[in-house]
Amino acid sequence: MGPNGAMILFHRSADWWPYCKAQLVELQDRLQELEGSGIGVAAISYDSTRVLFEFAEKRGISFSLLSDKDSAVITEFGILNTVVAEALGPKRDDPEVVAAVHKYVAASVFDSIQLRQMINGTPFPGTFMLDAQGRVISRYFEEFYRERSTTSNVLLKAGIGLTPIAAIEGTTAQLKFTAYPSNTTVTNGTRFSLAVDVEPHPNMHVYAPGAEKMGYRVVGFNMNPSELVRFEPVNFPEPEIYHFKPLDEHVEVYQKKFTLLQEAVVNASAEAEEIMEELDALTLSGSFDYQACDDAICYLPDSIPITFTLELEHLDYQRVNQR
């Protein structure tokens, strides 16, 4: 536990599951920043202490990897993957159980009784954020067993500031902006964020969701579709209400510095993995769109092109005891 709280990561395995390995390595990359913010870090799985020691030694992990061999802590937190146990019981061939297995346990092409037995005891993977008193203040879990939120993404969603990496900066007549990815390296199943920090100039405002009802162009962060990345709906902060006295309008705006978050998920399908094996990087393009006004003038809408290039890291399928 750090002086300002802790991040507790529950994962399936540092031995046989490549998506968890990638998540743990990315967490290590952010460890100095977390500790500098007074946040302690630990990761929990049903792996043996030997497996965790060897993985930490191999990948340079310095934070605590804790063994919950009998899944007691996992069960106490209420995140034991009960789908696995059900899939080993008398209803294992029930179509609904099989469908749940393919969403929360293993793809149909890999599914077997032996695999289910190996996975039994794992948690639904996710992250808990604790305050300084050890109370859970937020939690982040995935809907699909191959997807993993990065540490950087969790911190952005929790409102904990990051040092922007590979930022794109610009200034227009009405505002300043900085666009950056939460992570510059991604892999299959990575859930990350693209962010735009926006600071209107003095006496300027841009329009927030809700203002479209009055005919104004709302600020937007619009990424072009990609076959390898799924974009979630943009997260908008709460707006202010601006009173435009000449027309007696009350309209939703942003006048102070704010951040738009565009969460994105790298495709985790076998087909996408095959495509990405031939790639070294992902290029994602889109635009930051807005209309700005001051107390007297509404300026023409503007659209600023934005492109991010992210390094691709390939999944690690090698088990800990394999050399």
Region roles according to the model:
Residues 21-76, 82-83:
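Structural microenvironment flanking redox-active thiols in thiol-disulfide oxidoreductases
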Residues 156-323:
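Extracellular/lumen-exposed scaffold segments
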Residues 5-8, 124-126, 194-195, 288-289:
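Short loop/turn microsegments at loop-to-beta-strand junctions
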Residues 2-3, 16-17, 83, 145-148, ...:
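A short local loop/turn or secondary-structure capping micro-motif enriched for an aromatic residue
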Residues 136-163:
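Non-catalytic, surface beta->alpha helical segment in thiol-disulfide oxidoreductase systems
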Residues 68-146:
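Thiol/selenol-based redox catalytic cores and closely related redox-interacting motifs
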